[in-house]
Amino acid sequence: MIEAVNICVQRGKKQILNHIDFQAKSSALTVIIGPNGSGKSTFVKALSGEIPYSGKMTLNGHDVTHTKTYEMAAMRAVLPQFTTLAFPFLVHEVVALGLSVNQFTIAKKQLQNLPQKALECVGLADYGNRHYHQLSGGEQARVQLARVLCQIWEPVCNKVPRWMILDEPIANLDIQHQLVVMNIARNFARCGGGVLAVLHDLNLAAHYADKMILLKQGKIYCEGSASTVLTTQNLSDAYHCSLPVSELPKADTPFVLPQTASFL
């Protein structure tokens, strides 16, 4: 479980996160949504240890601030919104960066095959010897997801759930590969792991999320199931535009349809 208690992040005089409290459980896909500047990526950075915060954050009962880096790496893998590599890596070398924490939990022969298996999962089976910097933005994003998979290949290790922390994992992808990524995330959760993902696509969020958290101006505006969070009133208040919500025929999933030129 990820548990956040009274999390605050301040930059200069600006309060980015303001007393955030929530829980995300393993075996579930939790999605954070909200407008730009609402604090979504800031929360991910706090959880991954990139930025300081006040309050308490725990992952599987371990205090994020006081747990050793390698111990955290064995429990969770982070896919940041933006990734910059300083060296001219080949694709298989980038993916293999995720292997180090698995060297004591997975047999050596299986470990050697993991990068290729991970690339197959994201639809890049033949890309191993290509130069990472020559790939498109969407292809690079999928390579980074393969790295995440290498790091936490087994959703549960020694009876402890592992976590995917994904910050806008489908931002640069076409619809086919958006679905590939979201299916990987959902299957990881179904196998006992935990997934916390930041998404902007409200309809994909509605389809895949077991729990949704809507942020507005650094605070949790509401949380719960998709049908609880994705209401016309909630979305209009958070996004300041008209976002009518209906249900798809023969489905119990909300559908959000933005209206052109109807900003509030």
Curated annotation (Swiss-Prot):
It is found in: Cell inner membrane. SMART domains: AAA (SM00382). Pfam families: ABC_tran. GO terms for molecular function: ATP binding; ATP hydrolysis activity. Residues 2-242 form the ABC transporter domain. GO terms for cellular component: plasma membrane. The keyword Zinc does not apply. ATP binds at residues 34-41. Gene3D superfamilies: P-loop containing nucleotide triphosphate hydrolases. Keywords: ATP-binding, Cell inner membrane, Cell membrane, Membrane, Nucleotide-binding, Translocase, Transport. Coiled coil: none annotated. It is a peripheral membrane protein. It comes from the Bacteria. Its EC number is 7.6.2.-. SUPFAM superfamilies: P-loop containing nucleoside triphosphate hydrolases. Part of the ABC transporter complex HmuTUV involved in hemin import. Responsible for energy coupling to the transport system. Belongs to the ABC transporter superfamily. Heme (hemin) importer (TC 3.A.1.14.5) family. The complex is composed of two ATP-binding proteins (HmuV), two transmembrane proteins (HmuU) and a solute-binding protein (HmuT). NCBIfam families: PRK13548.1. This is Hemin import ATP-binding protein HmuV. It comes from Bartonella quintana (strain Toulouse). The gene is hmuV.
